[in-house]
């Protein structure tokens, strides 16, 4: 079964999978998700792309490793990404830290830290998001939330405004059709009997369970049928802490 990474590629000329967006969700209340980051990316193939991400320190954003590029500009404090507001903060990424074991074929270890050129100013529209502890286990059946600027329809375009959707954490067996799925590294998210999912353009965004980031949008099926695969943050807390410490975050 063909899978595709959830990176919102705006030029659909390459054979790579694209990013995810929110399908079956609703528009977020403006600035109710102050940790959300919109990433504008010049890819390694010189294409334009976009992803989601989230602020975890004033100068660090967490996202998916498949969102890496030659150049990344981060916008914080946005709701409608096409209408600039006084709440916006645009910050250049000066260093990218993809996980050293990231595999571009299997999309395992699909996690990356981005160091910003300047520290963000924390406001009502810009804030940080707490991460799952290392040994935190979120049981199947838990309802969580995902937000992003991705597509709202399989054949549609990306959303200008931030969208969000409630998704159910599934038993790992529900993702057994994904050959590279590893429940130790990843989460299986989205009820296959529903039409709600993250889709193209949502890659890198957070999965929130009880106000804590438990996952990162990674990949799903090219028809957006759930479940999709999310990177399990708790597994990577030692690596995240190491990078932050070494870079004085």
UniProtKB/Swiss-Prot annotation:
Residues covered by the Peptidase S1 domain: 22-245
Cystine bridges: 51-67, 144-209, 175-188
Chemical reaction(s) catalysed: Preferential cleavage: Phe-|-Xaa > Tyr-|-Xaa > Trp-|-Xaa > Leu-|-Xaa
GO cellular component terms, semicolon-separated: extracellular space
InterPro entries for the chain: Peptidase_S1_PA (IPR009003), Peptidase_S1_PA_chymotrypsin (IPR043504), Peptidase_S1A (IPR001314), Trypsin_dom (IPR001254), TRYPSIN_HIS (IPR018114), TRYPSIN_SER (IPR033116)
Keyword Signal tagged: yes
Main location: secreted
Recorded GO MF terms: serine-type endopeptidase activity
Subcellular compartments: Secreted; Cytoplasmic granule
UniProt EC number: 3.4.21.39
UniProt propeptide residues: 20-21
Keywords: Disulfide bond, Hydrolase, Protease, Secreted, Serine protease, Signal, Zymogen
Signal peptide extent: 1-19
An example Gene Ontology biological process: proteolysis
Active site: 66 (charge relay system), 110 (charge relay system), 203 (charge relay system)
Enzyme class: hydrolase
PANTHER family per UniProt: CHYMASE (PTHR24271:SF24), KALLIKREIN-RELATED (PTHR24271)
Record function comment: Major secreted protease of mast cells with suspected roles in vasoactive peptide generation, extracellular matrix degradation, and regulation of gland secretion.
Family: Belongs to the peptidase S1 family. Granzyme subfamily.
Protein name as annotated: Chymase
Organism, as annotated: Canis lupus familiaris (Dog)
């Amino acid at each position: 079964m063909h899978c595709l990474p959830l990176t919102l590629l705006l030029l659909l000329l390459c054979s790579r999978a694209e990013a995810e967006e929110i399908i079956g969700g609703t528009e977020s209340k403006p600035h109710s998700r102050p940790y959300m980051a919109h990433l504008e990316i010049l890819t390694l193939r010189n294409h334009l792309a976009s992803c989601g991400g989230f602020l975890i320190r004033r100068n660090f954003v967490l996202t998916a490793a498949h969102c890496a590029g030659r150049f990344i500009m981060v916008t914080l404090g946005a709701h409608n990404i096409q209408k600039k507001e006084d709440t916006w903060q645009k910050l250049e990424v000066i260093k990218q830290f993809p996980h050293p074991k990231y595999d571009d074929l299997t999309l395992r270890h699909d996690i990356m830290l981005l160091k910003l050129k300047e520290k963000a100013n924390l406001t009502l529209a810009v804030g940080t998001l707490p991460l799952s502890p290392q040994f935190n286990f979120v049981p199947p059946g838990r309802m969580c939330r995902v937000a992003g600027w991705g597509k709202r329809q399989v054949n549609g375009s990306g959303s200008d405004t931030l969208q969000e959707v409630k998704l159910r954490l599934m038993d790992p067996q529900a993702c057994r059709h994904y050959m590279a799925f590893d429940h130790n590294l990843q989460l299986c998210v989205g009820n296959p009997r529903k039409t709600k999912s993250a889709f193209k353009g949502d890659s890198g965004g957070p999965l929130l369970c009880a106000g804590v980031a438990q996952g990162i949008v990674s990949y799903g099926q090219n028809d957006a049928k759930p479940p999709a695969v999310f990177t399990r943050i708790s597994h990577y807390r030692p690596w995240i802490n190491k990078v932050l410490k070494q870079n004085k975050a």
